């Protein structure tokens, strides 16, 4: 090699870490340090896999692991579709339309986020149980007898997924609404000038532009769902979180629990990779500073009623009704709140 070739090769080798990690500025080093601290528990889980002999995992694979995987994936699908539909629809309505109560619903749609999923699960289980007010009223009105009618089982995969949807859709709502507010009305007007109807403009223009934000909201909802233990435990749904707990504390096999946790991490990474792959190299940026805010469309008549119902229903089901049920249960019990609960 010529001396010039040696110099070029040395420069290439020295630039490799910069291309991989970027310029090692104090801020970047600090970010890498924080990332390592946050990732330490995950690295600990992976490191704990080394002591596993595989017997416990083989037993789980032959008995409950297929059910665990099916339930976890079913919950992920229900939550992704449910939070996506509710979050996008409500965000679009309160951003693009004005109707009676729309200003109040803008912040009221965030209230279900304050309700833990297992608490709302307690409330709905009492509401929809055989001895609950709903089934009791139906039997009194229609004269039904025990075993003579069908009623959906709230303590199931579908019921647990519904609970997650009702309390986690605000993640998608928040991020989708922020994305819709950032969009310039010029883009939507251009699509209308090209002959697109409002629905077509929403599907072909506004929704793709908001896709990164929506994907982020759905990802947050999925992370909450996959990490939840209380709700699925109460509903009797076997998922990775319940299996990890029982393997660790019930069977006393920490290494097998780490293997299950690593499988759960693999599911999460697979979901993120699928979303990133489907997006490809697409990126979304404002290419012009000619921004005009969206002028909301005033709704009246049946359209206003439909918009109110669409936006108020998640608030009622995700916050108002569970709070009412909890107050009702407290009133029936007649117990006073113990002052010891507030003792420091």
Predicted regions and their residues:
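Short, Lys/Arg-rich, polar N-terminal cytosolic tail immediately upstream
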Residues: 2-22
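Membrane-water interface segments at the C-terminal ends of transmembrane alpha-helices
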Residues: 20-53, 63-181, 209-229, 257-277, ...
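Short amphipathic alpha-helical coupling elements at transmembrane boundaries
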Residues: 55, 59, 106, 140-143, ...
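Short coil/turn motifs that cap or connect alpha-helices
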Residues: 100, 196-197
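Glycine/proline-centered hinge or cleavage motifs at structural transition points of membrane proteins
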Residues: 194-195, 208
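Glycine-rich helix-loop "coupling/hinge" segments at transmembrane-helix boundaries
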Residues: 226-251
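Hydrophobic alpha-helical transmembrane segments and immediately flanking/interface helices
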Residues: 235-239, 324, 328-343
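Flexible interhelical linker loops that connect adjacent transmembrane helices
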Residues: 278-310
């Amino acid at each position: 090699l010529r001396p010039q070739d040696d110099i070029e090769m040395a420069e290439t080798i020295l630039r490799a870490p910069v291309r991989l990690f970027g310029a090692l500025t104090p801020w970047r080093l600090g970010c890498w340090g924080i990332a390592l601290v946050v990732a330490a528990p995950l690295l600990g889980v992976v490191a704990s896999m080394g002591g596993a002999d595989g017997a416990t995992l083989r037993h789980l694979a032959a008995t409950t692991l297929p059910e665990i995987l099916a339930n976890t994936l079913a919950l992920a699908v229900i939550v992704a579709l449910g939070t996506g539909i509710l979050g996008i629809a409500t965000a679009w309505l309160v951003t693009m339309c004005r109707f009676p109560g729309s200003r109040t619903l803008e912040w009221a749609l965030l209230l279900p986020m304050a309700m833990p999923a297992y608490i709302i699960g307690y409330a709905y289980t009492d509401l929809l149980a055989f001895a609950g007010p709903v089934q009791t009223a139906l039997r009194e009105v229609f004269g039904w007898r025990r075993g003579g009618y069908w009623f959906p089982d709230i303590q199931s995969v579908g019921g647990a997924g519904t609970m997650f949807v009702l309390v986690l859709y605000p993640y998608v709502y928040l991020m989708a609404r922020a994305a819709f507010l950032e969009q310039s009305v010029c883009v939507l007007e251009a699509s209308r000038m090209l002959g697109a109807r409002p629905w077509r403009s929403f599907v072909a223009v506004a929704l793709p532009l908001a896709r990164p934000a929506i994907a982020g909201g759905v990802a947050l909802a999925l992370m909450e769902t996959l990490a939840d233990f209380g709700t699925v435990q109460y509903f009797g749904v076997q998922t990775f979180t319940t299996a990890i707990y029982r393997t660790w504390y019930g069977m006393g096999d920490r290494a097998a629990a780490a293997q299950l946790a690593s499988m759960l991490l693999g599911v999460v990474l697979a979901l993120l990779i699928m979303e990133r792959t489907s997006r490809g190299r697409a990126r979304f940026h404002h290419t012009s500073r000619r921004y005009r805010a969206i002028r909301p469309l005033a709704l009246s008549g049946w359209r206003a009623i439909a918009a109110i119902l669409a936006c108020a229903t998640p608030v009622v089901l995700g916050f108002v009704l569970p709070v009412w049920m909890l107050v009702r249960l407290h009133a029936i019990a007649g117990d006073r709140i113990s002052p010891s609960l507030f003792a420091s």
